[in-house]
């Protein structure tokens, strides 16, 4: 019996599939019955492979030990399969063809097998599984993302993964069109491909590296600040870009909106020319305003606008003090000028900007981002004064108070002369100071206190760019001292607080909750950050980010004191030092100076900070002057001329601001073949900065700089040809060629060229050129990842409405709208208003207050659509109590700019008012008749 069982097991494991000479297929013959385990037949045979559904031809029999062939297929079933060309028996239910069923008796094996080793015939089972019929109720349920995929092949979630593959053309089973959707379907795939991300890794576990962003809120969103840099490289060189006029640079459909923002007038000569704001860096813009606003942190210091910001006081004048028939725009905190006033850079009126000035040699950085976890509520201190016994606090402050009211806050002076001595080193930004402890003050020579934003807590997000926030007034961006949670009640119930919600019905508890969600710096950023497992449980409103949505803004170059000394030592060891080597060493000193001013924590103490600042500045200027104004035996280095011209343009590092002197230095460097100097000479000739305007020379030098591969010059000359500016004939084909050439670098300096080229491709009727949706989306995406606000807003629109081959994905749309809103881009702010108005399930809840605040923020920038949206929300009572009179004023503003919906709404209101007045007398007469 033991031999019998062992032989039986051996028999069941071995399988041999081969065909006989007469064409009949047999299966399951034991291997030891075949003499020599070889096949004597030379005719082709049919073999069954475990990886193939159908039999294939082969000239040699194959001996296989197949794991999936544990159940045999008897000879009768094999004959049927052969006669029907592989059709399974289930498909032959209604077949009328008579099939011969040859019978193979087991007596043929009895003579050759021992009686005890005859195997027991198992029950026949099919080799494959036939899927069950789909459920009739959900037969047509197919994922939309699956339908738009070509190379992505995925089984329908209705049925388990079938073992039948329908990608072969010779499949005998006939399946109707409706059933094909429940099997493996291959559908064209759009470009770009949208990843169906579910937040899990390959093995189905939650991804610990998943990135989130905080919901974009008006009063807590961060603002993109400019990092001061003495070397104007890295990104688009927008030198004197704000002196351009709209008619000279912008396309007819107003595509380059950033060029129309004129920042201010030139500073007056005399002592005031040496007076600049006391920022962490001494650099300033070529268009630096004489008076600057306190920045978005002061304007949005946790205050929700009250109803009075939106309502009108009488029939002709609204809360902004503007008559309904005026052209000027409303504003909350700044007096905005009209676009006609902003176009003239030589206007004598004082321009108060709503956003920080743009620096032609700067890099964008982000303010520290808050943690989505609830943190202690901040006070509204604008200066962080240490709580000590001495009374050195400014007027209006009480050191013993933990929560001074807003009414007692002192105002900052915005125009004070810079002290001649080196300013003290600010408090360490990256030290170990706890955010709950007060930051020691830093007293300047004027007795004022400059604060540094404290380090975020442990659960705070990781910064997108390691940088220091820069303010544009006498003090650095202020920090807010946290207070215990129990003081929230006193804040919310204080009678003198100026914080008010848009809706008058919002309770104090809701206000306290809003305050508690703010960071201790009041600059919470929806920037990307990583959240750990513990923070994930506490973060309920965080929005998951798509892995493909990220920015590629280059990090600022950091040169430490050790790097500078190492470079100096390396230069001293050289046998011969050239003028170019000395200029490169001067640039190292400038980078070290910039790093130390933006990161004062790198200095160990105050004395080291002052010494290094002096050394870096002195050595850099000496080396540059030596090679810019050399003796007769030396050659002038163009780079030194260019950098000193840059300093004269800005008035930094001890150089007096002199635009004429700067133009002379740019011209000398341009004659020496310096590429960027040629571009700046052309800009000066076009705008008349430091020289008399000359359009003919301007175009010639633009072409010369473009031939030197200056991307900015390519972009300018392309706009000139596209619009026929500066006396040139309109040549669209040549302009498009220059734009395409400018886009080849695909770097930060090409952001405007890529955006403009994509906009031109979207207007084939006007320009006669077009491109595929994939190409247009690629240009927008490359421009957006380098931080261009207009392109970021366009991506948000694409992901909102499913444009340019994209899938409609709310989280990606909100992400890119937020990136553009951080740069005060009006269209993006209106887009966020729309998302808050409608909400997105599981991503962003509805919030009427935020919708109104974002729309109002965009309306204050003069956006007609946003003005209509504010009027609509105020008329319907969304986010604020209904106020038809104020809504009417907003409709008038939008209608004056030609917005059709606003005009239509005003006509409807006029018609309804006429009908009301016409019906009123008749009703009165009827009442009189009834009485009589």
Curated annotation (Swiss-Prot):
Region described as Disordered: spans on this chain: 1-53, 264-356, 374-406, 905-932
UniProt-listed Gene3D superfamilies: Tetratricopeptide repeat domain (1.25.40.10)
Keyword Phosphoprotein: yes
Coiled-coil positions: none
UniProt keyword terms in alphabetical order: Phosphoprotein, Repeat
Source organism per UniProt: Schizosaccharomyces pombe (strain 972 / ATCC 24843)
Underlying gene: chr3
Protein name: Chitin synthase regulatory factor 3
Phosphoserine modification, residue list: 393
């Amino acid at each position: 019996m033991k031999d019998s069982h062992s032989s039986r097991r051996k028999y069941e494991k071995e399988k041999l599939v081969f065909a006989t000479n007469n064409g009949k297929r047999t299966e399951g013959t034991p291997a030891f019955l075949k003499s020599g385990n070889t096949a004597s037949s030379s005719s082709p045979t049919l073999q069954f492979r475990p990886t193939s559904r159908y039999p294939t031809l082969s000239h040699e029999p194959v001996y296989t030990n197949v794991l999936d062939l544990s159940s045999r297929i008897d000879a009768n079933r094999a004959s049927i399969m052969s006669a029907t060309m592989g059709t399974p028996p289930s498909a032959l239910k209604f077949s009328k063809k008579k099939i011969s069923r040859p019978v193979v008796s087991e007596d043929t094996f009895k003579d050759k097998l021992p009686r005890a080793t005859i195997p027991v015939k198992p029950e026949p089972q099919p080799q494959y599984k036939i899927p069950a019929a789909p459920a009739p109720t959900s037969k047509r349920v197919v994922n939309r993302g699956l339908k738009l995929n070509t190379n992505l092949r995925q089984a329908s979630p209705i049925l388990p993964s079938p073992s039948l593959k329908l990608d072969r053309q010779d499949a005998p089973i006939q399946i109707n069109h409706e059933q094909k959707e429940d099997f493996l379907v291959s559908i064209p795939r759009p470009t770009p491909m949208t990843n169906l991300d579910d937040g899990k890794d390959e093995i189905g576990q939650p991804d610990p590296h998943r990135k989130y962003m905080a919901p974009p809120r008006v009063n807590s969103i961060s603002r993109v600040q400019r990092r001061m840099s003495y070397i104007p490289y890295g990104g688009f060189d927008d030198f004197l870009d704000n002196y351009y006029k709209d008619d000279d640079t912008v396309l007819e459909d107003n595509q380059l909106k950033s060029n129309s923002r004129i920042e201010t007038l030139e500073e007056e000569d005399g002592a005031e020319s040496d007076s600049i704001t006391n920022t962490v860096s001494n650099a300033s813009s070529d268009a630096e305003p004489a008076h600057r606003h306190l920045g978005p942190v002061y304007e949005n210091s946790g205050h929700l606008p009250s109803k009075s910001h939106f309502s009108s006081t009488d029939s002709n004048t609204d809360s902004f003090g503007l008559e309904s028939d005026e052209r000027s725009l409303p504003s909350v905190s700044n007096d905005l000028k009209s676009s006609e006033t902003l176009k003239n850079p030589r206007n004598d009126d004082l321009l108060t900007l709503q956003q920080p000035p743009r620096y032609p040699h700067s890099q964008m950085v982000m303010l520290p981002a808050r943690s989505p976890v609830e943190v202690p509520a901040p006070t509204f201190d604008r200066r962080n004064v240490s709580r000590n016994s001495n009374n050195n606090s400014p007027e209006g402050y009480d050191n013993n108070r933990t929560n001074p009211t807003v009414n007692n806050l002192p105002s900052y002076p915005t125009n004070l002369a810079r002290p001649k001595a080196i300013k003290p080193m600010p408090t360490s930004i990256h030290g170990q100071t706890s955010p709950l402890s007060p930051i020691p003050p830093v007293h300047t020579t004027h007795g004022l206190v400059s604060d540094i934003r404290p380090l975020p807590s442990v659960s705070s997000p990781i910064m997108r760019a390691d940088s220091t926030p820069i303010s544009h007034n006498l003090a650095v961006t202020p920090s807010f001292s946290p207070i215990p949670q129990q003081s929230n009640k006193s804040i919310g119930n204080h009678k003198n607080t100026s914080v008010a919600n848009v809706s008058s019905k919002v309770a104090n508890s809701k206000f306290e909750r809003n305050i508690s969600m703010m960071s201790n710096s009041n600059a919470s950023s929806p920037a990307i950050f990583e959240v750990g497992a513990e923070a994930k449980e506490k973060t309920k409103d965080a929005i998951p980010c798509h892995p493909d949505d990220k920015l590629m803004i280059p990090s600022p170059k950091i040169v430490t004191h050790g790097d500078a000394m190492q470079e100096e030592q390396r230069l001293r060891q050289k046998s011969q030092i050239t003028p170019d080597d000395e200029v490169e060493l001067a640039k190292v000193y400038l980078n070290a100076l910039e790093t130390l001013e933006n990161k004062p924590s790198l200095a160990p103490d105050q004395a080291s900070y002052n010494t290094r600042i002096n050394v870096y500045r002195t050595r850099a200027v000496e080396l540059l002057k030596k090679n810019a104004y050399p003796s007769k035996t030396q050659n002038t280095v163009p780079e030194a001329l260019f950098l000193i011209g840059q300093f004269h343009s800005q008035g930094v590092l001890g150089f007096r601001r002199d635009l004429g002197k700067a133009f002379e230095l740019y011209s000398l460097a341009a004659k020496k073949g310096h590429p960027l100097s040629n571009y700046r000479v052309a800009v000066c000739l076009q705008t008349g900065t430091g020289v008399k305007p000359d359009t003919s020379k301007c175009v010639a030098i633009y072409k010369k700089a473009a031939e030197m591969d200056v991307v900015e010059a390519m972009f300018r000359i392309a706009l000139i040809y596209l619009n026929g500016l500066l006396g040139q004939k309109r040549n669209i084909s040549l302009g498009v060629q220059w734009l395409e050439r400018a886009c080849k670098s695909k770097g930060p300096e090409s952001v405007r060229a890529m955006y403009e080229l994509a906009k031109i491709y979207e207007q084939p009727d006007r320009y006669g050129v077009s491109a595929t949706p994939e190409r247009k989306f690629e240009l927008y995406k490359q421009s957006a990842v380098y931080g261009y606000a207009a392109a970021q807003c366009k991506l948000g629109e694409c992901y909102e409405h499913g444009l340019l081959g994209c899938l409609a994905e709310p989280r990606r749309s909100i992400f890119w709208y937020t990136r553009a809103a951080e740069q005060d881009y009006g269209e993006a702010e209106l887009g966020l208003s729309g998302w808050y108005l409608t909400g997105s399930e599981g991503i962003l809840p509805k919030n009427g207050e935020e919708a109104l605040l974002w729309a109002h923020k965009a309306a204050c920038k003069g956006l007609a659509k946003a003005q209509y949206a504010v009027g609509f929300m105020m008329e319907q009572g969304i986010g604020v109590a209904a106020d038809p009179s104020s809504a009417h004023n907003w409709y008038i503003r939008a209608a004056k700019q030609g917005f059709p919906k606003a005009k239509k709404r005003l006509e409807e209101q006029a018609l309804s008012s006429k009908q009301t007045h016409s019906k009123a007398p008749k009703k009165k007469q009827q009442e009189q008749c009834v009485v009589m």
